[in-house]
């Protein structure tokens, strides 16, 4: 009988392959080992994502235009796809790629690069562009003297660091010697007209400089090129779902108000995957609209024209304009209309204006300082209403013709009055069974379950960040996946805030969830958060990482996600004996190989 190698159960390799692997391991540093681990895991899990390019002889000397989409909520991706199609119609060879999949170390070989990028959090790049951002800002970034580029930034002027990610990339490209095709454009939430002009000017600039870069053609790297998906329903053309269930799932004594909402899509051709988000068009509360109009002495029946449609001012405020979030620009304009000394003093001091913006909803400002405005003056103050995105908390394989979302109601208690968020207030308070809701799917290919169903996963969440992991477990259960599953979840109280408790207990009983660690911050004197539970399980988490586990984080970007990342860096540093810089490189390698994925907001 042949003697069995003791490694056979673990390594499906020949003796020669195993010896070569052991020799390679002997010569590798910790960083190199981490990179190889991620590299081979990516090879095992990747599928073809190639767009076929066909060029005729006359096109072979044309420069390739690389369009990079760096999106947080889908707007940058949408505009990138439009630019790709626009270039194709104008006989330009282009490729479209997500920032997450871009091989940024090859940027030195690019001739023309267009970056369309949003900004999240405190002036940070979107999640899928973090690795690209860190590389281009590092000392390892190459000389870009041969690069022609343009940056289109997407943001919101109500935030201090407006379009900061785009500004950072633009500045760095210039520092590295890049040649700007067109001045960077920083677009506010109403970007349509600006984008149209920018894309036309960009094409003209590319054509005018064609002789300069046509002699040297950049290589079209087909691997990871983004395949354009066709979805019948979009932000501009939403579907109409039907509310099946709208149920509060936090306890009566909870400080949080969280709703589980189920939507019927049986008559719609909608497909989605775990990790995707649901876009929701909401309506402003009718009482809020009436109060604003009354305080400003505007008749609710007055009509205005919006995009060639004549509608009442009431309809306009309820369906087309943002009424819950105040902004610095609104406050400044309102102060100038009112001539109110208090407001004038507020806008003359940056710190006071910042605090007033945060703590004073639009309706409170109008209530405290009413004046008479015309309908057109009011509309000129306001920002357009935009849809809100919610992580989908269901798997279509499991529940078929439904979509579930988990909505945390935004509440502010100011001067004894509770102010609700526009979208969350609408979803939780206004919608009942059989009501119509306008929706669309926002795909998120950067937050997907592993293709290999044997891959272990670690899910880290707090609050409503648990939503996509409910979808993940439904999918894993439906697939009979053998991969281990570890859930970390944090919220204030066990009895009041354990979202979907019965379902998690069912999965534990079935053996689908291997480990579950819970953090209840207010159930004991010393507050315990999810990052504390992570540190408590340092050695086992490291063991899972060595086994090829993929790590998912969903929750608050400014606090929870940052604290979790610090905890993960501590685990890497301790178990791999790396310093902080090496640990950051290790974690970045996990991100690059799609083993560390975040959906934060």
UniProtKB/Swiss-Prot annotation:
Keyword vocabulary terms for this entry: Amino-acid biosynthesis, Cysteine biosynthesis, Electron transport, FAD, Flavoprotein, FMN, NADP, Oxidoreductase, Transport
Cofactor binding, note field: Binds 1 FAD per subunit.
Enzyme Commission number(s) from the entry: 1.8.1.2
Listed GO MF terms: flavin adenine dinucleotide binding; FMN binding; sulfite reductase (NADPH) activity
Pathway(s) the chain acts in: Sulfur metabolism; hydrogen sulfide biosynthesis; hydrogen sulfide from sulfite (NADPH route): step 1/1
Assigned GO CC terms: cytosol
Entries under Pfam families matching the protein: FAD_binding_1 (PF00667), Flavodoxin_1 (PF00258), NAD_binding_1 (PF00175)
A single BP term in Gene Ontology: hydrogen sulfide biosynthetic process
Binding site for FMN: 71-76, 118-121, 154-163
Top enzyme class: oxidoreductase
Domain FAD-binding FR-type: 236-450
Binding, NADP(+): 521-522, 527-531, 563
InterPro entries registered for this protein in UniProt: CysJ, CysJ-like_FAD-binding, CysJ_Proteobact, FAD-bd_FR_type, Flavdoxin-like, Flavodoxin/NO_synth, Flavoprot_Pyr_Nucl_cyt_Rdtase, Flavoprotein-like_sf
Catalytic activity line of the entry: hydrogen sulfide + 3 NADP(+) + 3 H2O = sulfite + 3 NADPH + 4 H(+)
CDD domains: SiR
Flavodoxin-like domain: residues covered: 65-203
Cofactors: FAD; FMN
Domain of life assignment: Bacteria
PROSITE patterns named among the record's database cross-references: FAD_FR (PS51384), FLAVODOXIN_LIKE (PS50902)
Residues at which FAD binds: 324, 358, 388-391, 406-408, 421-424, 601
Family the UniProt entry places it in: Belongs to the NADPH-dependent sulphite reductase flavoprotein subunit CysJ family.
Function: Component of the sulfite reductase complex that catalyzes the 6-electron reduction of sulfite to sulfide. This is one of several activities required for the biosynthesis of L-cysteine from sulfate. The flavoprotein component catalyzes the electron flow from NADPH -> FAD -> FMN to the hemoprotein component.
Assembly: Alpha(8)-beta(8). The alpha component is a flavoprotein, the beta component is a hemoprotein.
PANTHER family: NADPH OXIDOREDUCTASE A (PTHR19384:SF128), NITRIC OXIDE SYNTHASE-RELATED (PTHR19384)
Name of the protein described by the UniProt record: Sulfite reductase [NADPH] flavoprotein alpha-component
Organism per entry: Buchnera aphidicola subsp. Acyrthosiphon pisum (strain APS)
Gene name, Swiss-Prot/TrEMBL: cysJ
